[in-house]
Each structure stands twice: as C-alpha cells, then as structure tokens.
Amino acid sequence: MKEWRREILGRELVVQHGKVAKQSSGAVLVRFGDTAVLATANISDKVIEGIDFVPLTVEFQERFYAAGKIPGGFIKREGKPSESAILSARLIDRPIRPLFPKKLRNEIQVIVTVLSADPNVPPDVVGIFAVSLALNVSKIPFEGIVAGIRIGYRDGQFIAFPTEEDIEKGLMDITVAGTKDAVTMVEGEAKEVSEEDMVKALRFAHSVIKELVDFQEEILSEFNVEKIPVVEPEPPEGLVETFNSLLDREELERRILVKAKKEREAALKEYEEKLLSQTAEALSIVDPEEIKPFVSELYEEAVKKTMRRLIVEKGIRADGRKPNEIRPISCEVGLFPRTHGSALFTRGETQSLGIVTLGAPMDVQIIDTLLEEGVKRFMLHYNFPPFCTGEVKPLRGPSRREIGHGHLAERALKNMLPPEEEFPYTIRVVSEILESNGSSSMATVCSGSLALMDAGVPIRKHVAGIAMGLILEEDAEVILTDIIGMEDHYGDMDFKVAGTRDGITAFQMDCKVSGVSDELLMKALMQAREARMYILDKMYETISAPRPHLSRYAPIIKVTKIDPDKVADVIGPGGRVIKKIIKDFDVKVEIDDETGLVKVVGNSEENVDNAIALIREIAKEIEVGEILEGKITRIEPYGLFIEVRPGKIGLLHQSKVGEDMRQFLKKVKVGDTIKVQVINIDDLGRLQFKRVKEESPQHGEVHNKRH
C-alpha cells in the first residue's frame, strides 16, 4: 500500500493505492477534507464489434452512510441512481471521455463510490481527480491527467470550494475541469455575471487545477504501467487508395451543403453507399459488408474535413449560413387553453414546446439526497422523444442526457424567479422537444422563459440561451454561432451560454481539443452575447412582461398570518378543525407552526376567501365581555355547552341562562344557535358564558361571521 499527501487550499489531500479494491485494474482511495471517494476503473478483454465510439460507462454511487444517514422511504437501501448521482456521473464523464484513444472498442466501466461526504467538498469534483488517477494507474489506455474544482464568486472574490452560504449569497456556482494546459469542461450557474468575470473565474479555477494535476504527476512518476494495446483492424490492401481515388470531393461538398437536415443526411448516406459499392467492385470483393467499417470510417473523416474546410476557407456552413449567423427564429405563446402557460420556440430545425404548470405549496418536490434535504419549488423537465429526430425507439424513463439538459435549463432560469413570499406557487416547466438539430437545451431555456411569462409568473427578465461552436485548425480558428448537430459532432468545442440582457445565468462547455486560450474564449463569449441579445429581442417582441393575471385554470393561493400560539386552535384536537375547513370549503391548507404563516389553496376564490376568514376568526383572541353567537353542542342538567368557534367550546351554566332552566330547555335543542357573552376565561383557557337574551333561538341555523 502506498500513500501520498499534499496540502491544497488549506485541506489535506490524501491518495491511497493498493489498500482496497486490489483486483480492480485501477483503484484509488482519495480523501480531501472530510470527503472520501473510491474510484475504480476496469476494461473488458473483448472488443465490441460494429460500433464507432468508445464504450465508456461512468457510474456514481451515493452511499447514504457517507453522510451519516439512512435512506428515506419504505426501502431502507439505495436503489437506482438518483438524479443528483446521474448529474455527478455526467460531470465526471465529460472531462475524461475525450482522453481515450478514438479507436478503443473495449468496454470500460468507471465507478465512483462516495464513502464520506463533506458538503463543502463535493464528492463529484473529488471524483474527477480520483478517476483520473485510477485510469492512469490501470492498464486502460488513457491519454492525459485531469482534475476538477468548484468555484464561487462573492464580494468580488473568487472562492475555491465555496460553502453553501457562499453560493447562496454569491453570484456564481460553477464546476471546472481541465488538464495542466487548459480548461476542458465547465458546468454551472450565475446571477447575471459578465463575460469578463466568467473568463476570470476560469482562469482562477485553472490555477488550482494545475496544482492538482501536478500532485497527480508526482504520484504517477512512481508507476510504470503497461497499457493494453488498442486493436485497430487493418483494411484490405489498396482499400484506402481506391477509396480516395473514387471520392469526388466536389460531389461530397454539394451533398454537405444541402440545407435541410433530413435531406442532407439522406444525400450523404446515399453517397456513402455508392462509394462502398464502387470500392468493393474495384477491389473485386463480392460482399461489400466485409469492408463497410473501413469505408464508413474513411467517409466519416472525409465529411468532417470537408465540412471544416468549407467553414475555414469559404466561411460557409452546412446549412448555408455565415459563422456568426443565427437560424430563423419564431416565438408563440398561449397555445393551449387548459395549460397554465405555454410557448413554442423554434430556431431553424430545433423546436421546443414549453409548458408551465402552477401548483400548490404542498406540491413541492421533496429532496432527500446524500448532501441535500429540503424541498424544491421550481422544476424543469426536458423530454426528448424519438420523433423529434424522425427515429423509432422504445419509450422509457428519462435518459441521462434528458436529465442533464433539463438541469442546465433549470439552472439558467431559476435565479429569475420571484421569491416564495411574493409568489407562493410551486412551478413546473416541461420542455417537449418536437424537432432537434442542435441546441435543444438552449431552446428549452427560451421556451421556458416565454411560457413562464405567459403563465403570469412574475419573472424579473427573459432568459435566452445559445449554443456556440469552434473550428480550430493550425492556421485558423472560427467561432460558430447557433451550431447544428453536424457542427457539434465534427467541431472542436461546444459551449452553451444562457442569460439575460444584463449577464450570464448558466454556462456549459466541453472541449475536444487540448484547450483554448483566454482570448479566444472571451471572443466566443462576446459573440454569444450578441446572439443572445438578438434572441432576447425576438422574445420581448412576443411577450414583453408577465401576464397580469394567472390562468383561470390555475389554483388560487392566498396567504395570511396568524399568531403562532393560535396554530393549535386552527388545527384542533386530532386535526378536527382543520379537516373540517378543508372539507367544507374544498381547499388545501398549509400552516407553518413556527411563523404562523397560513397558505390556502383552492379552485374557487370565494371558498379560499371564506376559509381564510374562518381561520382568522378561529385565531382571533376571545376576550372577556365579548358577545358571540354559538351552537349548542351538548345539554346537561347543570347547563349547556356552546361552540362559539370551531373547537372553542364553553359552558353556559344554568345560573346564567336568565330564566328557569326547565322552561328554557323546552325551547332549545342540540344544534340551535344562541347568543352569549364571555364572562370568564380560566387559566386553562376554558370559557364561561352568560346568555344574551333575544326573541327566540334560530332552530338549526348556524351563523358563521366571516370578514
């Protein structure tokens, strides 16, 4: 067993190898502060045939014992990965995936298990460091060293590994990963920060990443691991030369420049099949399927080079646009009568339908994860059905990609929402992707913002998002605005920026090359800002402010405040009083027993108002001398029990009836109303009444005074 230690950012970073999980190809136990993770990396001996990608799976295992907790619910053990675990797995996957050899076809599984969790040192960020080491000490081919860090920005200062208070009171919460040379991955949110501050944050993050990478280099200098060879099947003799001689580059260029996505894909597929047939014929191969993998690879590379050359040399993109040109945009709101808010945002061949549903305060999402407990009142869910790309696939639960895209869009919008005190509704936004050709997560931000305003949610400003790309050659660099799927696939970087007219609210970047300079990143961010302003103008033209009224189908929520000491009176013995209010007025009621804040939800404004009036009446202090009207609930020889408010029952003694008791009892029965005056309240809060004479009691009638 070997152990290495180094102090970084005031915390001790400890790495152990050879102590646990020794049968794993690569395994390290990393402890940073009070957070400890075990990272393991293994590879299958078998090569998977017929695929054109690296078969990598990253799993992130949250163990509740790491935070000293037992899982909630009926089943007291961890089940399928939570959304937070899936997001953590994606966060680790993204910086390591580009560092595997492109031709590697053996299945790789990376597992990060959280053994101890410190809220101020995120386990997923430590996991990036641990996975990098586990892969490098394993036999798995891996070409680099990466590390990650979480950055906050508060009071003009950048903070590494910010506390929850720093995040809440600060302006930024981003996770950054990279190599010694450059930042390669960013994911996070901000409260309308400038492009300059974002670049400064990445620069600060990289200074810490370099120190973390340096520590890894020190550790790895003691290892000399033999990596397994990457098996690359040799093409038949003469195939490459034959293919290149048959390839008509002008014909390929014409097919790439077909504007519509489906037509372009069909044209390129047709030409690939033609080249496959011609190559097989030229090489006297009877079955073209024998050489299909080789031809497909050569063709893919030719398409990539041609598309990039068109952009760099001619400034023309596959759909005919210039590098900084945005596809045609259209916005619509108020599409459906029964939804609380709706919007359709279309950008070229990407289309998102945003739907807003307003719910009661009790509709919040309960959060009980490894490091978080509480409730979530704003949710954004992103759906990517197969028909949006014209494909046929089985419909299952949300994929990791759908969860990740929805999370990014949610972070982009959430800081524009009103506080709960101003708008007590639970808010759910659903984005249905109806068409997709690049940047559907940013289309979700736009449709979500439009739908929120259509629903009457008082968001402070519109938020728009744009996806940017980069083509980086030795002699040229071209930044692309509003990338399509093809440019995302063949480009060197894609980054998504969402924000208002005043700053960035969410940012995501993935770099396939060794990294980009601060100057180039700043240039790309400013180009993204121009695009964002253009989209925001279109959105403001469609709906410039939240609608003044909510949908008539949205629930009605009204809030009142009572004395916290009176909460028990409103609830009543065994909940009897509150249950009756809920049943009588067809409402939902939520009471905070610490603050006395009462929220009443219903579909009828009259019922909600009446319920609130009754709650206020119940919570109102009863004073000696006050005249009240109550209902007879019980008759005894010594007097009558009168309920003057729900749950508030007092005694009208026979001596206080004001006439002969036997004669009076002939005129009344249980359920009748009677007017009484409070003459005493004892130390236990028990009420004593005297009768206030009136002409005659109203049989069977109950008077509820409501204000």
Curated annotation (Swiss-Prot):
Mg(2+) binds at residues 488, 494. One of its GO terms (biological process) is RNA processing. It is an enzyme of class 2 (transferase). SUPFAM superfamilies: Eukaryotic type KH-domain (KH-domain type I), Nucleic acid-binding proteins, Ribonuclease PH domain 2-like, Ribosomal protein S5 domain 2-like. Keywords: Cytoplasm, Magnesium, Metal-binding, Nucleotidyltransferase, RNA-binding, Transferase. SMART domains: KH (SM00322), S1 (SM00316). CDD domains: KH-I_PNPase, RNase_PH_PNPase_1, RNase_PH_PNPase_2. This is Polyribonucleotide nucleotidyltransferase.
